[in-house]
Amino acid sequence: MRVTVLTGGATAERAVAFASASQIVAALRSRDHDVHVVDTCTGLLDDAEEANVLSGNVGTTPPSVAELDEQERKMLSESLAELAVVRGSDVLFLALHGGAGEGGTLQAILDVIGVPYTGSGQLASALAMDKDLSKRLFRAAGVPVPAWFMSPVAPEDVKTGLGWPVIVKPSKQGSSVGLTLVRKPQDLDAAVQLARRYDDEVMVEQFIPGRELTVGVLGDVPLPVGEIVPKHELFDYESKYTPGMSEETFPAKIATRLARQLQEYALTAHRALKLGGYSRVDFRVSPDDDIFCLEANSLPGFTRTSLYPQAALAAGIEFPELCERICTLARNKRPARGDN
């Protein structure tokens, strides 16, 4: 196959995207596919540029707002539609996280170009990126979610409606960027201001003590449940992308009944958002085994430490085969019209 990997982008998760792309490119080339790499900020990468950007580490903190502004100034001026390598591809593999690349904008452009691409369509991508809208759809589909408010919200309303502590996070952001665990009313405003650096809409969410679990979906089949035990109190940016900062177990050592319920909820959430190809759905499970769905990821990470490839491996799917399967799913799906 002729595969073009789209990566980078002007988002807080740019480094994560490159780390995912590095693994995907190596896996597909190991199967003798013709692979090119395009940074959606700067365009087609030559061999030297590719080696440079795909060899870096994610780091322990996301980029600053100033760095994001600089990336936006470097945004690709030539339309993706005019890149011959894009139009000549059998499939586009989206190694993108956050921003236009994951939130539906790029998907809408690719629908016009007419080249198959991995993951979900424009509408599903936009819904998954918006935590407020996606949680409303989960709840309507019968998937339990933590209670939440959208900022602004008064501390007394937080105490009454959610209780302390709470999670404050940007509504449309991933990798725990801009996320804070707030224990006291006097710390709420600072947490909201931090989250607002990354998105105009901020969610204040009930904190669920307990276990962190995740379920991948491939095609229309749930993968084995995984459990994450981070070294920090939360599964934050550093815990997600620094080797040794969290312990992941696939399959999770949980009761069969609980695992099946999590898989059922993951598939329901996947369908509620009309996600396609693959996704990962994250949960918290209370000490009483009450399940709460946090979010669905339409383009889960494919880095060395990412959860989705570990889930696939637990199902007997090696990483190169996983990448090929995702490409095949993309090539076999009907032309997108913003509804898949």
Residues covered by each model-derived region:
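A glycine- and small-aliphatic-rich helix-loop capping segment at beta-alpha/alpha-beta transitions
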Residues: A108-Y117, K184, D189, A314-A315
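ATP-binding N-terminal substructure of ATP-dependent carboxylate-amine bond-forming enzymes
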Residues: M1-L123, L127-M129, L133, A140, ...
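Hydrophobic beta-strand scaffold residues
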Residues: V35, P116-Y117, V145, V166, ...
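Active-site nucleotide/adenylate-binding loops and adjacent lid/helix of ATP-dependent enzymes
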Residues: V3-T7, A19, L83-R87, S125-R211
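Phosphate-binding site of ATP-dependent enzymes
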Residues: R183-E264, V285-F292
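ATP-dependent carboxylate activation and anion-phosphoryl transfer catalytic cores
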Residues: M1, G8-A10, L137-R139, R257-N340
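Short, flexible, mixed-charge acidic loops at enzyme active sites
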Residues: E50-L54, A108-D111, L234-T242, S298
